[in-house]
Amino acid sequence: MKIRVLSLILAIVLSLGMVSMFASCGETNYAENNTTIKLGASGPLTGGAAMYGIAVKNSAQLAVDEINANGGFNGIMLELVMLDDKHDANNIATNYASLYEGGMQVSLGTVTTKPGLEFKGYANADNVFFLTPSATGDLIAEFGNGYQMCFADSDQGTASAVVFNNDYAGKKVGIFFKADDDYSVGIKDNFVKALDASFGTPVMASFTDATADSFTQQVSELKDCDVIFMPIYYDPAALFMKQGNGIVKADAIYYGCDGLDGIDAVENFDINSITQGVSYLSHFNSNTTEGAAKTYIDAYKAKYGNDAPLNQFGAAAYDCVYAIYEAMKSSGADIKANISASDLCDILKGEFDTDFVFRGITGAPEADGKSTITWTDKDGNATNGHVNKTPVSYTVKEVTNA
């Protein structure tokens, strides 16, 4: 009798364990009661990187509103939910759980890289498709469900080196980077690898969170360089430029990547007060006067005003929403409002990894004012989530009074 009772108890325990195991494997469809298709995102809406997060939220919402005004997806409205992570990876676990359990079916991932490296693991475990506008780390798209609208760090570093090889031959090159930031180090490493040997060894100067209050030492180390590569964000870049004014060569060029977008709008920094030139590798020109990008800019300013942050992060988010929407249409699948995140992920992967071509506002525009964007190479092979489009070099400020 005791043996039979023990066997029964063991069977119940094993049964409950199996139920628990299956429940934790993504079987729950938190979207089963959805009446809209929910897009989730996490980004800095407050703090030092808020200029990026706000632009992403505004632009994604603009795209959602435009799509909904035209009938949504087969009559189903889209809904955007974006949470503040303050550019802190420690906030991602809570944000992701809130988004996923709140019915998120597809995602824009995160705005910045460090939080994105945390986000990708959760999204992979639940098979949630995400297309990030601006988390550039190479490993963001490590798993098969992650994609980037922005150029990955390796691509930014390599493309920037091509600009230097073509435009700055014979110049003395310096590099100012953040040694405790994956974004900065990743771009720097790939830039150095692709830089022509004729430049010799670049002059290196770095900083960390603990040393970000003053760059007098770094300015001194780089003051004789002709071109200073800055794979960093705009706040520390602006501080370096302010402290380097009158010390760094007057006709030097500061050259960055997407993190420098917004450098001309940093509080308490007048970019025209320095003599040096400022340029960065980009996939969007916020001052363009024509094409689809201009249409987006006009709509953005009409909705949010002239003082709202406007940058390539936001433009990429606008493209992200439309790319997801167009891919859903292109799939021909019977997508309902309560489709599970996993099922929608499989549908979208089938598009992005094959012959799906998106015409967007980021990347070098073609004759019709739009750019060609894919996630495959020239031979049609999947690029493991990395975007394929033509970058542009954008000049914020020319050298003056040198």
Language-model segments: which ranges?
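Extracytosolic ligand-binding ectodomains
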Residues: 21, 25-402
